[in-house]
Amino acid sequence: LKRCKESVWKYKGMWEDFSATVGFWADMEHPYVTYDNNFIESEWWALKQIWEKGLLYKGFKIVPYCPRCGTPLSSHEVAQGYKDVKERSAIAKFKAKGEDAYILAWTTTPWTLPSNVALCVNANEDYVKVESKGDTYYLAQALCDTVLGEGEYTVLETYKGADLEGKEYEPLYQFVSPKEKCWYVVCDDYVTLTDGTGVVHIAPAFGEDDAKVGRKYGLPLVQLVDGKGQMTPETKWPGGFCKDADKEILKDLDERGLLFSAPKFEHSYPFCWRCDTPLIYYARESWYIKMTDVKGELIQNNNTVNWLPESIGKGRFGDWLENVQDWAVSRNRYWGTPLNIWECECGHRHAIGSI
C-alpha cells in the first residue's frame, strides 16, 4: 500500500506538467486523491444513489479480464489497448454422431475448444453436406469454395440451418461431464458467412455471444481456464497460459485427425493497458451499473451538449453511447475504493452512503 500511495503523488506531478503543456485548466491546489477518505465517501454517496435507483447489481457476465492483474476492465480501459495481431485460427472437425461425417467449425480462439459445449449455425442460411477428398463435411454452402477449394467437392445434401438444429456430435475433448445437455447444434442469427465455415463453436464461459446462446439453450458453463488465465488441472495442459496453449491444442487435434486447417488470421485484439497482457473474455461475478437502462437519457443529454468539433459528440462519443454496455465497476484487487455493499450470509444486501 505504501508503494501505491507513492505512485499517486508521482503521477500527480506528471499530470500537472502534462495539463500545463496542453493548456488544460484544473484546480491543481486541491486535487482529489482516490485513497483519501473524503473521496471514498463521495464515491460511496454516488454509488448509494445508484443503488437506490435499482441500477447497481451483482451479475455473472462475460467481461474483458486481465489474467495478470486478476481483474475485469471497463470498456474505457479496453479501448486503450487494442493491437493488430496475427494468430492461428482453427477449423476443427467435430464428428457427427451416428455417421461418418464431420461438422467443420471455425474459431479464432483454439484455447477455448476444450470448453466447447455446442456448435451454432444461422437458421436462415443454406448449409450443405459435401464429399471432399474422401471425407464428408457439413458447412455453409456459400463458404464451400473458400474452405474446400473451387471444384474440390461434391454436394450430397442441402439444408437450412434450422434443419440442423439438435444434431448431435462427439466432443473434441471430454475433460468434464456436464449434467446439462450439450454437444449438439444450436441456432442464432449472430452467425454470419463473412469468414470461417458458417458454423461457430460455442463456449459460454468465454464470449458474450456464446453466453447469450448458452442462456437461450440452457447450456452448461464449462470453464477450463482459471483466474490466472492458466489451463486447469482437468486438461492435458495444466498451468500453461491459455493463449500459449493454442499451439499445443492445434498439434493435439492434428495428431488425432480432428484439425481440418489452422489458417493465420489477422485481427484487432485487446491488451491490458497496465501490463500489456492479452485480455481474455471471461465469465466473472462482478458488480455492474445498468447503463443500458439509462441509455436513452444519456443519448438525449448528449444531444444538448455543444460539442466542438461537432463530429466528436455525434460521432465517436455518440456512437459509444449508442452501443453502451452495463459498466463493470468492481475490481478484484486490494488497492482501490472499497465497494460500499455489505452482504450477510442470508443474502441481504445493504448500501453504505457515508463513512
Which residues make up each language-model segment?
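Catalytic alpha/beta core of large soluble enzyme barrels
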Residues: 115-121, 125-227, 254, 294
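Residue patterns forming the tRNA-binding/recognition surfaces of aminoacyl-tRNA synthetases
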Residues: 1-114, 166, 190, 194-353
